[in-house]
Swiss-Prot record:
Gene3D superfamilies: Nucleic acid-binding proteins. Part of the 30S ribosomal subunit. Contacts proteins S8 and S17. May interact with IF1 in the 30S initiation complex. It comes from Natranaerobius thermophilus (strain ATCC BAA-1301 / DSM 18059 / JW/NM-WN-LF). Residues 8-20 have a biased composition (Basic residues). One of its GO terms (biological process) is translation. This is Small ribosomal subunit protein uS12. The keyword Ribosomal protein applies. The modification 3-methylthioaspartic acid is found at D89.
Length: 122
């Protein structure tokens, strides 16, 4: 515990904020190429086959991104747009693929929340 005089001489150092999506390097999204598309199982109370893609970004980093929505058309060498946003029940997945951008098709027959899944009206 510092004394009052020590605090006057040298202020307390604040701990900086931890970045949630460091691979994007302060960009809102990044383009990348899929190196592997697969499924994985979530953490303990949940059970499913979640679709994920390993993506090499334009800055050279390789990240694991979640593919949201029902069904997708991604395969190896697909060019995708990646945004930040973790998936709570998948450890190590801190990015998501943007649906309806570049090689990623939007979700078919989506009626509500269409803007999040790249689906046109009608």
């Amino acid at each position: 515990m510092p004394t009052i005089n020590q605090l006057i001489r040298k202020k307390r150092k604040s701990t900086g904020k931890k970045r949630t999506a460091p691979a994007l390097e302060k960009c809102p999204q990044r383009r990348g190429v899929c190196t592997r598309v697969s499924t994985t199982t979530p953490k303990k109370p949940n059970s499913a086959l979640r679709k994920i893609a390993r993506v090499r970004l334009t800055n050279g980093m390789e990240v694991t991104a979640y593919i949201p929505g029902i069904g997708h058309n991604l395969q190896e060498h697909s060019v995708v747009l990646v945004r930040g946003g973790r998936v709570k029940d998948l450890p190590g997945v801190r990015y998501q693929v943007v649906r309806g951008a570049l090689d990623t098709a939007g979700v078919e027959d989506r009626a509500q929340g269409r803007s999040k899944y790249g689906t046109k009206k009608g």
